[in-house]
């Protein structure tokens, strides 16, 4: 192909030159004549004779060809060089007769040079271009072509890669789903292969036993054995397929899941298609039917509930085991109709038509889309609040659906235990009702349940009988409430509920041997008092298993006999007033009849370990009495009991009746105590306690509670006392039984207690020792508040030994009185000093043992009265100002000589005197002015007088203006519980004080002082008391 530039370029002088050359060539056949031009005039070894400069030719050697080189730029063609071409190469390149450019111009100078060669004479004069024309874009056409191609290839590659990635992702997801589904399908195939090959032609439908939303249930016979057959219509084919596949899941065999036999389809006689599920037959039917026909005791009810929970927990568990895999399954239609009862009293779960297999957050239902509506449930009555609200947590479908099942399980618990006979003692068990049947009836609508459950947050109500405050009932109610909690995430898991149901059975079995967990309704108040607090009150004392906070804390625990008030259903009761008629006011009548004997250690211990001081005893009627149980000495201290006063033991009453009036008295709510201790200030607490615990006059004739401390002191010292009852019949007496022969009670600690009512009275007698309570072990004259029968009257006129310690204080360079130890009765009888020393030595050792234990250590940070009840009696107002001023004066004025005495008796030991009960008269000091002071709140009371008047006894209730007050105790500990000291008024207690020693000051003048711990207690109503003195140092004893 020739381009437009193929027009020959002619030189004007060429015609005649060609003619001349052709003539010469003819003569020289062997040589080639070519046009020659070399602007650079290079010497190529060619002779000048061979070049013709005139015509510009050259005679080439043999075998050479002619060539020409031109430059083409900007439309012009310039000759660059011509001559002979002698390079050896392809001979076909220069075989043309004309000089033709056939090759693409080289890239030198942007392709502007043209080169050609030829094999004839003067053929290189002109040239002809014979190569494909360049692109229309003259600027680097090859590069543009390569760039476009690269872009196209890149785009194509990216597109293919993207498609490949998408295909891989899709394939991976499909493979992942297919792998689980394939494993499931494989298991389904294995399960299908494991199904028995039964001929359904032998299946006979005998009777209709139930009809549901998705089909009917028949009792049938397959190969002569009873079976249950569920028949699905064609419209419910999907439910049949789903339930069949759930039953075929590997590892679905469980004791609490209904046993599946076979599933098949068949055509009826009228040409309809129906689907059959053959299952094991359970004669008792559904749980709903069973509960409507039967009641059960506690253990049977727990067995029903536990078996249902166990089956549900297995359903909710994902279980990979070898080549088999069981996914977690949500039932989604759990109710009492879908639970069947076996012959052994356990349950199985059935009806899995709406169940779903749960795999993480994915739902798997064969034959349906994965995004099946999870709000679909079987029964509206059992719908959880979040389902009614449409607020199911879709981000965690597995947990959400399990929580829906747990809500329904809580309703089933309620239905089961509403038919428990043990939870309705003394009354008929209510008829069976489904959950919310009282509120919405038998056919509730979705809107009804939405308003009731979701909006109003109501649940089935617990009956009044379930308010019994026992551990088993409380645990049951907590479990049910935790299952149907409004917050789905706060509900129990099935595994946790299973453990709780197992514990409920254990609690019942463990407690029924000690005391019935659920008692008759007449003892509800007593059980609430005993059982609701025995867990929160810490065990104290050297025998924690036998002690409780209600045990009376006394400073002496090792006496021969101790009078205790017992308030428990295990306490001894007296003989009934009327034999022919059952005493309705007595608690546990049969138990009282069986236990009206000598108390056993088990009953004695139980009566002490189940008490709490939460009742107000000011309102007791005269018919109540005191129960007396003697306490044996401990083995390591029996050698100390050598006094002959313990040998004379009379009949001891051991059983009295406990009436409902005792239980109907006001009790302190423990929650109020905690609230008072934590929230209110001291002043507010005092005001609250006055309002809450005010009661009748404790000093009235009908109140005998204040006689208890004196009787206790006398009994501890003598071990002998006769009691009589004035209004409630004769007490059960056991003649000729020594207190040491009766089972001992546990030793109690002498923990600091706050004072209760302690009215003091004057006694117009002459010189008698003063009474002062030891500051170390505080005031132990306490009011008994265990809420049971108490002693009304004390008519004994026999002498009683009272231990008295005289801690005299002497100044420097002064002698003390003699150390003769005597025991003198009020009527003049005096015991020997040897006996007194024995009792005194034993009492001192007992007091030391009370304060050496780690648990009994007294400190400010751990006050033991935090769990004690608040004051209940409103004490009389009268002389409290004088007593409080006296306490403040004694606290603020130190003893002369630089010695002080604190509550804990940490002061330096001082010399001690033993004096006679008659006392020694001393000089009276001038009374000092009284200063009004703010009422203090002592934890330990120092009730000793601060002055004496000329040998006569001083009343404690007198004002400090009668004499100069002496140094006294410092109150170091702050009482945490509120109380207030009110007026001290005269009562049957007579406590006299008198100066027994003299203390010399630095100036050498004598001043009347009092004994540090001298006491003398007398009975004002005809009885006598005995004062004992001891010379042991540091001993304070009552």
UniProtKB/Swiss-Prot annotation:
Single Gene Ontology MF annotation: transforming growth factor beta receptor activity
Pfam families: Activin_recp, Pkinase
Sequence ranges of Basic and acidic residues compositional bias: 872-896
Effect seen on changing residue 118 to W: In PPH1; likely pathogenic; loss of function in BMP signaling pathway; does not localize to the cell surface
Impact when changing residue 248 to G: In PPH1; uncertain significance; unchanged subcellular localization
Record annotation: effect of changing residue 491 to W: In PPH1; loss of function in BMP signaling pathway via SMAD proteins activation; no effect on localization to the cell surface; no effect on BMP4 binding; when transfected in epithelial cells it results in constitutive p38MAPK phosphorylation consistent with a gain of function in the activation of p38MAPK cascade
Result of changing residue 162 to P: In PPH1; uncertain significance; unchanged subcellular localization
S-S bonds: 34-66, 60-84, 94-117, 99-116, 118-123
Glycosylation sites noted in the Swiss-Prot or TrEMBL record: 55, 110, 126
Record topological domains on the Extracellular side: 27-150
GO CC aspect terms: adherens junction; apical plasma membrane; axon; basal plasma membrane; caveola; cell surface; clathrin-coated pit; dendrite
Subcellular location: Cell membrane
Keyword annotations from UniProtKB, A to Z: ATP-binding, Cell membrane, Disease variant, Disulfide bond, Glycoprotein, Kinase, Magnesium, Manganese, Membrane, Metal-binding, Nucleotide-binding, Phosphoprotein, Receptor, Serine/threonine-protein kinase, Signal, Transferase, Transmembrane, Transmembrane helix
Phosphoserine modified-residue sites: 586, 680-681
Effect of residue 341 to M: In PPH1; uncertain significance; unchanged subcellular localization
Effect caused by changing residue 67 to C: In PPH1; significant decrease in nitric oxide synthesis by endothelial cells
Principal location class: membrane
Signal peptide: 1-26
Family according to the record: Belongs to the protein kinase superfamily. TKL Ser/Thr protein kinase family. TGFB receptor subfamily.
Quaternary state and interactors: Interacts with GDF5. Interacts with BMP4. Interacts with SCUBE3. Interacts with TSC22D1/TSC-22. Interacts with activin A/INHBA.
Functional summary from the UniProt entry: On ligand binding, forms a receptor complex consisting of two type II and two type I transmembrane serine/threonine kinases. Type II receptors phosphorylate and activate type I receptors which autophosphorylate, then bind and activate SMAD transcriptional regulators. Can also mediate signaling through the activation of the p38MAPK cascade. Binds to BMP7, BMP2 and, less efficiently, BMP4. Binding is weak but enhanced by the presence of type I receptors for BMPs. Mediates induction of adipogenesis by GDF6. Promotes signaling also by binding to activin A/INHBA.
Protein name, entry field: Bone morphogenetic protein receptor type-2
Lineage: Eukaryota, Metazoa, Chordata, Craniata, Vertebrata
Name of the gene: BMPR2
């Amino acid at each position: 192909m020739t381009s437009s530039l193929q027009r020959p370029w002619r030189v004007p002088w060429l015609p005649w030159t060609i003619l001349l050359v052709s003539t010469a060539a003819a003569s020289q056949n062997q040589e080639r004549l070519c046009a020659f031009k070399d602007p650079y005039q290079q010497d190529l070894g060619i002779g000048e004779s061979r070049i013709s400069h005139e015509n510009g030719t050259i005679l080439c050697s043999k075998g050479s060809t002619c060539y020409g080189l031109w430059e083409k730029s900007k439309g012009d063609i310039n000759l660059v060089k011509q001559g002979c071409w002698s390079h050896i190469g392809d001979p076909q390149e220069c075989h043309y007769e004309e000089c033709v450019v056939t090759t693409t111009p080289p890239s030198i100078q942007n392709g502007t040079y043209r080169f050609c060669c030829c094999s004839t004479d003067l053929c290189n004069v002109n040239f002809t271009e014979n190569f494909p024309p360049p692109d229309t874009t003259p600027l680097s056409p090859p590069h543009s072509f390569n760039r476009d191609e690269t872009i196209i290839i890149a785009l194509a590659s990216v597109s293919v890669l993207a498609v490949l990635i998408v295909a891989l992702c899709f394939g991976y997801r499909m493979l992942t789903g297919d792998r689980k589904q394939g494993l499931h399908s494989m298991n389904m195939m294995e399960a299908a292969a494991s199904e028995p090959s039964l001929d359904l032609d032998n299946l006979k439908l005998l009777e209709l036993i139930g009809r549901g939303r998705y089909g009917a249930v028949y009792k049938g016979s397959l190969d002569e054995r009873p079976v249950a057959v569920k028949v699905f219509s064609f419209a419910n084919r999907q439910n049949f397929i789903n339930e069949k596949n759930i039953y075929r899941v590997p590892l679905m065999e469980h004791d609490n899941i209904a046993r599946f036999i076979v599933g098949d389809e068949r055509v009826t006689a009228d040409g309809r298609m129906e689907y059959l599920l053959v299952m094991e037959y359970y004669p008792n039917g559904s749980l709903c039917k069973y509960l409507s026909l039967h009641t059960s005791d506690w253990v049977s009810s727990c067995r029903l509930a536990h078996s249902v929970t166990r089956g549900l927990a297995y359903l909710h568990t994902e279980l990979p085991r070898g080549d088999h895999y069981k996914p977690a399954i949500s039932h989604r239609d759990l109710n009492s109709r879908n639970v069947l009862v076996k012959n052994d009293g356990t349950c199985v779960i059935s009806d899995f038509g709406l169940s779903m297999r749960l795999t993480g957050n994915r739902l798997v239902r064969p034959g349906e889309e994965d995004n099946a509506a999870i709000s679909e449930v079987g029964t509206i009555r059992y719908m959880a609040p979040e389902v009614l609200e449409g607020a199911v947590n879709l981000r965690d479908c597995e947990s959400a659906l399990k929580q829906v099942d747990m809500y329904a399980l809580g309703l089933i618990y309620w239905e089961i235990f509403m038919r428990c006979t043990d939870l309705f003692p003394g009354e008929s068990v209510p008829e069976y009702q489904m959950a919310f049947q009282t509120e919405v009836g038998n056919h509730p609508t979705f809107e009804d349940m939405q308003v009731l459950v979701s909006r109003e947050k109501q649940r089935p109500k617990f009956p009044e009988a379930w308010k019994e405050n026992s551990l088993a009932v409380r645990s049951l109610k907590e479990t049910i409430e935790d299952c149907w909690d409004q917050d789905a995430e706060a509900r129990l898991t099935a595994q946790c509920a299973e453990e709780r149901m197992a514990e409920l059975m254990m609690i019942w079995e463990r407690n029924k041997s000690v005391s019935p967990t659920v008692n008759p309704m007449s003892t509800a108040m007593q059980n609430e008092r005993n059982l609701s607090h025995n867990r929160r009150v810490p065990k104290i004392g050297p025998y924690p298993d036998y002690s409780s906070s209600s045990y009376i804390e006394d400073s002496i625990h090792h006496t021969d006999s101790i009078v205790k008030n017992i308030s428990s259903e295990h306490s001894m009761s007296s003989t009934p007033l009327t034999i022919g008629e059952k005493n309705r006011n007595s608690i546990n009548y049969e138990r009282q009849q069986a236990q009206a004997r000598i108390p056993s250690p088990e009953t004695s211990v139980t009566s002490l370990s189940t008490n709490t001081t939460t009742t107000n005893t000011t309102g007791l009627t005269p018919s109540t009495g005191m129960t007396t149980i003697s306490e044996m000495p401990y083995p390591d201290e029996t050698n100390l009991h050598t006094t002959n006063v313990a040998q004379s033991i009379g009949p001891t009453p051991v059983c009295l009746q406990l009436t409902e009036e005792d239980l109907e008295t006001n009790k302190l709510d423990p929650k109020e105590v905690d609230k008072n201790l934590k929230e209110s200030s001291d002043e507010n607490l005092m005001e609250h306690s006055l309002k809450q615990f005010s009661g009748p006059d404790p000093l009235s004739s009908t109140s005998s509670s204040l006689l208890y401390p004196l009787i206790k002191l006398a009994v501890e010292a003598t071990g002998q006392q006769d009691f009589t009852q004035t209004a409630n019949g004769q007490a059960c007496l056991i003649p000729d039984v020594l207190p040491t022969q009766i089972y001992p009670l546990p030793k109690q600690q002498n923990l600091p207690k706050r004072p209760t009512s302690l009215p003091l009275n004057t006694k117009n007698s002459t010189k008698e020792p003063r009474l002062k309570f030891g500051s170390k072990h505080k005031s132990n004259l306490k009011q008994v508040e265990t809420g049971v029968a108490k002693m009304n009257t004390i008519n004994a006129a026999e002498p009683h030994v009272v231990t008295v310690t005289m801690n005299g204080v002497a100044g420097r360079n002064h002698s003390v009185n003699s150390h003769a130890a005597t025991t003198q009765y009020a009527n003049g009888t005096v015991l020997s000093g040897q006996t007194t020393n024995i009792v005194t030595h034993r009492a001192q050792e007992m007091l030391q043992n009370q304060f050496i234990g780690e648990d009994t250590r007294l400190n400010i940070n751990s006050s033991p009265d935090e769990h004690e009840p608040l004051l209940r009696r409103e004490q009389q107002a009268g002389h409290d100002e004088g007593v409080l001023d006296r306490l403040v004066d004694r606290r603020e004025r130190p003893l002369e000589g630089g010695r002080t005495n604190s509550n804990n008796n940490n002061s330096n030991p001082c010399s001690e005197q033993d004096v006679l009960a008659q006392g020694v008269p001393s000089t009276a000091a001038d009374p000092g002015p009284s200063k009004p002071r703010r009422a203090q709140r002592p934890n330990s009371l120092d009730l000793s007088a601060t002055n004496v008047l000329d040998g006569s006894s001083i009343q404690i209730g007198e004002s400090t203006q009668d004499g100069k007050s002496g140094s006294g105790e410092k109150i170091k500990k702050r009482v945490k519980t509120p109380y207030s000291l009110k007026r001290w008024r005269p009562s049957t207690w007579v406590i006299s004080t008198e100066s027994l020693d003299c203390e010399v000051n630095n100036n050498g003048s004598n001043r009347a002082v009092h004994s540090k711990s001298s006491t003398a207690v007398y009975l004002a109503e005809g009885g006598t008391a005995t004062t004992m003195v001891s010379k042991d140092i540091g001993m304070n004893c009552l």
